[in-house]
Amino acid sequence: MVLKDPRATSGLPKQKRDGVSHPAQPVGADFLILVVDDSADNLAMISLNLQQQGYQVVTAGNGEDAVRIAVQTEPNLILMDINLPSLDGLGATRRIREHEALRDVPVVAITAFGTEGFQRAAYDAGVAGYLTKPIDLDRMNQLIARLLSPGSSGNLYKPIGRKP
């Protein structure tokens, strides 16, 4: 299988600065997203989708690693599977929220459980959005764009390298 390098610029629109054409900056270039799922296939699919949009991506396969990586990298957004080994996604979200620098980072719950009661439990744990499996990539992309937009409620807009 051949994967296209999302940093390749041939398909990106050009911006002109000083009369010279330069590749336009990808939509998500300033943002780091942590993707957490215990399925390697889901991690690969979601990560590739995000990288093709220009987002920087880090991954974790369980809740404990998710907390550790979130603390180390301070991502702009977290996509969190709920049914995880070692520490479930709701527990990981609660632990992430204990860290001052991560309190306003949007967490999007991803799960096969779509019941209203389970959604309420996810929001009570501190998630900012909710997606059910199988994942609709268009819906996921729209939710991410909304949560990362400046002034989004529940979100601290902080592109990589810039702290509020």
Region locations from a protein language model:
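Charged docking surfaces used in two-component/phosphorelay signaling
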Residues: 44-52
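Non-catalytic signal-transmission and effector/linker regions of two-component phosphorelay proteins
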Residues: 1-34, 138-164
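Short hydrophobic/Thr-rich beta-strand motif most characteristic of the beta2 strand and flanking loop
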Residues: 54-61, 69, 131
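Short, glycine/charged-rich "phosphate-handling" switch motifs in NTP-dependent
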Residues: 128
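Active-site beta3 strand of CheY-like receiver
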Residues: 73-79, 84
